């Protein structure tokens, strides 16, 4: 049985990855699961300088999901290279680093800095809805997506993935902009812009007012967008958004995703990624499927 997939030149032992911002740098989850079993770890979003993030509250539970407004809190790219990367190098798992710049120059600076051993891929975050500069402001403009991708590709030999926002009219246009800029793959979707209101105080729950919705509630939207993106580009698509079971993961792959990433479910069930991997294996056995790649893009549409 072959579970190996190739995403933009990066060979993964299986198609199950972690979604950035939901798995930290793997340390905490390493106490619950064997990190070596994962297809890839996508680390928490990094910025050039340390970032405090947004004031609390940062998380708010919703029916079938959650809103978050963390604001990319992190210790910066230098601290990651010095303190976190050595830990990840001890594992036999692909490491993809999510970077979030406020300017095109910042994206290129971090990508160049991360063009080192132990880093297998770069995920360009042009889709975070919880920051005032950069983030989704880039991701809703195809020209910005193209320019950022082009500049990052100039300075790194690593696999370059562009993480797209769902808060656009045509996801295919944005995916094509990333492809035209030289991206090796696209990942989608990031969170959907949402909000919550305290009816007692009549004020927004979040200081930023707008937050990012994730979890099972967004899965049908994510699935539709992955389907559209996979039809719009020739490069691999990594699907995510509300995946909490192997059945969810298979839906994304049948729709055209070469790999999948699990996010919010990690907060609910630390074993979610492993359960999805095992579920896919069982599905393949029951359906006499020898190669996972037979499933990818196998949707039958009349």
Curated annotation (Swiss-Prot):
Gene Ontology BP, a term: 'de novo' UMP biosynthetic process
Gene Ontology cellular component list: cytoplasm
Pathway of action: Pyrimidine metabolism; UMP biosynthesis via de novo pathway; orotate from (S)-dihydroorotate (NAD(+) route): step 1/1
Location in the cell: Cytoplasm
Binding annotation for substrate: 44, 68-72, 125, 190-191
InterPro entries: Aldolase_TIM, DHO_dehydrogenase, DHOD_1B, Dihydroorotate_DH_1, Dihydroorotate_DH_1_2, Dihydroorotate_DH_cat, Dihydroorotate_DH_CS, Dihydroorotate_DH_I
Gene3D superfamilies cross-referenced by the UniProt entry: Aldolase class I
Pfam families: DHO_dh
Cofactor entry: FMN
Enzyme class: oxidoreductase
Keywords attached to this entry: Cytoplasm, Flavoprotein, FMN, NAD, Oxidoreductase, Pyrimidine biosynthesis
Residues binding FMN, per UniProt: 20, 44-45, 98, 125, 163, 189, 215, 241-242, 263-264
NCBIfam families reported in the protein's UniProt record: PRK07259.1 (NF005574), pyrD_sub1_fam (TIGR01037)
Subunit structure: Heterotetramer of 2 PyrK and 2 PyrD type B subunits.
Family stated for the protein in its record: Belongs to the dihydroorotate dehydrogenase family. Type 1 subfamily.
Functional description taken from the UniProt entry: Catalyzes the conversion of dihydroorotate to orotate with NAD(+) as electron acceptor.
Designated name of the protein: Dihydroorotate dehydrogenase B (NAD(+)), catalytic subunit
Organism: Thermoanaerobacter sp. (strain X514)
Lineage: Bacteria, Bacillati, Bacillota, Clostridia, Thermoanaerobacterales
Record gene name: pyrD
